Amino acid sequence: MKHHSPVRAIHVAVSWLTVVPVPTPTVEMDRCTGGAVITAVPVVGALLGTVAAASAFGLSHTALPTALIGVLLVVGLALITRGMHVDGLADTVDGLGCYGPPERVAEVMKSGSVGPFGAAAIVAAGAVQAVGFAALTDQHRWYDIVFAVVVGRFAAVLACRRGLGPAAATGFGAIVAGTQRRSLIVWPIILLAGAATLGAAGPGGYDAAHAVAAATTFVVVA
């Protein structure tokens, strides 16, 4: 990736995290490239959040109940992202649920199958997200939907901040671990300020509590 172009980093991130039919990136995934791609993940979140908010807005003008709209948004985001985060959540919870030593946890997480703990986590996370989307749709909190999805993706940046080592010595995690500056924590604060400014112009004004609650939910389960 020449000069770590932000545009190229976003291109790689979109290709990696979504099913959007962009040209296949031709880059060498070294540590510098991987770090730039991780930094671009919240931009993908902004794209996904905009799609989710626009879909919620359109569906809110139909006869569909908001609960069903929430479910459709969760399913839609899972399809757009290849279910990558859903699969990762299941692997993580299955690993933690085995109550074994670190080696056993890593083995379970790499198995590729979904166990009872992982299945329960998927159902619980999907239900929480659907209820959250439904509540925000019912109150016409379109900016909060975008904000929540963006901050949910920003969790990946925080997980790769300096000072945190990789779980394994090989793989993509080893490439990107510790590549993000700690100062990047200011971005969620900027996003919150931006959401407050934009949300104030929406119907009924802006309620920071909704954005914070929604963002917290998506950071935990996205």
Write out the residue ranges for each language-model feature.
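C-terminal membrane-associated helical module and adjoining short loops/tails
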Residues: 1-6, 165-222
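Cytosolic, membrane-interface loops and tails of multi-pass inner-membrane proteins
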Residues: 2-3, 7-37, 93-108, 160-179
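Alpha-helical transmembrane segments and their lipid-water interface positions
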Residues: 19, 85, 94, 119-122, ...
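Membrane-helix interfacial "entry" motifs
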Residues: 29-33, 37, 41, 62, ...
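Multi-pass membrane catalytic core of lipid/isoprenoid biosynthesis enzymes
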Residues: 33-52, 92-140, 144-147, 183-197
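Membrane-embedded alpha-helical segments that form the functional core of polytopic membrane enzymes
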Residues: 38-93, 143-148, 206-222
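Membrane-water interface at transmembrane helix exits
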Residues: 56-60, 81, 85, 133-137, ...
